[in-house]
């Protein structure tokens, strides 16, 4: 039986990695070994940052809500507690959008929170 050197499989594997590394800077898209390392790192970054993105957006929403709440004389935590007491179930994403797009509606929500806190 003839010896098989596996050049087809090797070329296919290398081609796949170099295709994934397309657009990387310098040797990271030219050389197989460095490209492979960078692709592995890219998978790690993608996995990590899909989770990080959720935390980052929540932080952004809280910062926006806090800024709008302070314009209405409340801190973020007092506003959230007041909304909970008033049985107003609006999530942070929607609250942040309301704070930016419709200041009057946010002010009305802040007033409701103040009333609930006063009781």
UniProtKB/Swiss-Prot annotation:
Keywords: Ribonucleoprotein, Ribosomal protein, RNA-binding, rRNA-binding. Pfam families: Ribosomal_L20. GO terms for biological process: ribosomal large subunit assembly; translation. GO terms for cellular component: ribonucleoprotein complex; ribosome. One of its GO terms (molecular function) is structural constituent of ribosome. CDD domains: Ribosomal_L20. Gene3D superfamilies: 6.10.160.10, Ribosomal protein L20. It comes from the Bacteria. HAMAP family: Ribosomal_bL20. Belongs to the bacterial ribosomal protein bL20 family. PANTHER family: 39S RIBOSOMAL PROTEIN L20. Binds directly to 23S ribosomal RNA and is necessary for the in vitro assembly process of the 50S ribosomal subunit. It is not involved in the protein synthesizing functions of that subunit. This is Large ribosomal subunit protein bL20. It comes from Lactococcus lactis subsp. cremoris (strain MG1363). The lineage of its organism: Bacteria, Bacillati, Bacillota, Bacilli, Lactobacillales.
């Amino acid at each position: 039986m003839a010896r098989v050197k596996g050049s087809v499989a090797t070329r296919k594997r290398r081609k796949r990695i170099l295709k994934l590394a397309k657009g990387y800077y310098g040797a990271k898209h030219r050389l197989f070994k460095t490209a492979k390392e960078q692709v592995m790192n890219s998978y790690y970054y993608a996995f990590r940052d899909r989770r990080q993105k959720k935390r980052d957006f929540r932080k952004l929403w809280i910062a926006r809500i806090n800024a709008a709440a302070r314009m209405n004389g409340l801190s973020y935590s007092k506003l959230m507690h007041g909304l909970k007491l008033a049985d107003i179930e609006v999530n942070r994403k929607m609250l942040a959008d309301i704070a930016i797009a419709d200041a009057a509606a946010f002010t009305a929500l802040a007033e409701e929170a103040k009333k609930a806190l006063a009781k």
